[in-house]
Regions:
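Active-site-facing substrate-recognition patch
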Residues: 1-54
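Glycine-enriched loop-and-adjacent helix/strand subsegments that border the catalytic/binding cleft
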Residues: 6-8, 60, 81-84
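Hydrophobic alpha-helical segments and helix-packing faces
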Residues: 38, 60-64
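Short glycine-rich phosphate-binding loop at a beta-alpha junction
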Residues: 53-61
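Short, hydrophobic/aromatic-rich beta-strand segments within well-structured domains
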Residues: 57-58, 69-70, 81
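Short, catalytically relevant binding-site loops at active-site mouths
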Residues: 63-66, 87-89
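Short Gly/Thr/Asp-enriched flexible loops that form oxyanion-binding sites at enzyme active sites
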Residues: 66-75
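Short, glycine/charge-rich flexible loops or terminal/linker lids adjacent to PRPP-binding catalytic cores
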Residues: 78-107
Length: 107
């Protein structure tokens, strides 16, 4: 497997190189299952955004959910919000925006 070396938040990781299209490859930065990386990245990101500089925390589903959860935990935020690709039945009045994903090539 080809990898891309990265040093982030004081930690070293080897990102797997993943083919998205014939012309596009990405280093997949995935925090699922890496508690040490998630905690360290959340700590460093929170240093960049003072608590009084935002009203809400928002992230895209799904790979960043552990990171925003840890950021909320460390900052004492009671809530954070997840942007999804589509509405679910349990969402009574979702905000809807059309966008295109680079990894799935779908709207």
């Amino acid at each position: 497997m080809h990898t891309y070396p990265i040093d982030v938040a004081g930690l070293h990781r080897e990102l797997p190189i993943c083919k998205v299209t014939d012309d596009l490859y990405i280093g997949a930065f995935i925090v699922f299952g890496d508690a040490e990386l998630t905690v360290a990245c959340a700590r460093e990101l929170l240093k960049l955004v003072p608590a009084d500089s935002y009203d809400y925390m928002l992230t895209a589903e799904a790979k960043s959910i552990p990171l925003i959860h840890e950021m909320a935990r460390q900052s004492g935020a009671a809530k954070y919000f997840i942007a999804r690709k589509g509405p679910k039945a349990y969402m009574p009045d979702p905000l809807h925006v059309v966008d295109k994903s680079i990894t799935t090539a779908e709207e």
